[in-house]
Amino acid sequence: MKISYLVIVLIFSSSVSAQSTNQPSDYIVSEIISVYDGDTFRANINELPDIVGKNVAIRILGIDTPEIKGKCKKEKTLAIKARDFARKALFNAEVVIVKNLKRDKYFRLLADVYFDNTKLASALLENGLAVSYSGKKKSSWCKND
C-alpha cells in the first residue's frame, strides 16, 4: 500500500513539475517600438512581465546585417536598406511573432522573428541584406570597397 501510494505521489509530482517548467516558446509582439538596423529592434511583448517584455531589444537569431555606423560607405548604404526592409516588414505586418527566445552577451533577446508567417531572417538573406551568423566573428561588409 505504501509503495503504490509513493508511486502515485512521485508520478503526480513529476507531471506537475514538468507542467510548471513548460514555458511558451512563441510570443506575439504587441507593439513594435523602433527598428535600429536590419537585425535589431525594440518591442513590447505583453505576454511577458514588464521587466522582460516592455521596450525590449530583440536581435534576430542566425543572421547579421550591416551596421548603421559601418566602416565604409558600402556597409552604411546596405545598412540603411536592411533597416528599411525590416521596418517595412515589422511595422506593416498584421502579426509579429518571436520564437526560440534566448539572451545574447548584451542581454538582448535573441529570437526567430516572423512577420505574417514569413521568417524575417530568411527574407533578409534572400534579399542580400544579411549573412548567416552563429555568434562567432562577423563578416566584413567592406570587402572590395
List each language-model region with its residue ranges:
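Small beta-barrel nucleic-acid-binding modules, primarily SNase/OB-fold domains
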Residues: K2-Y5, S15-D145
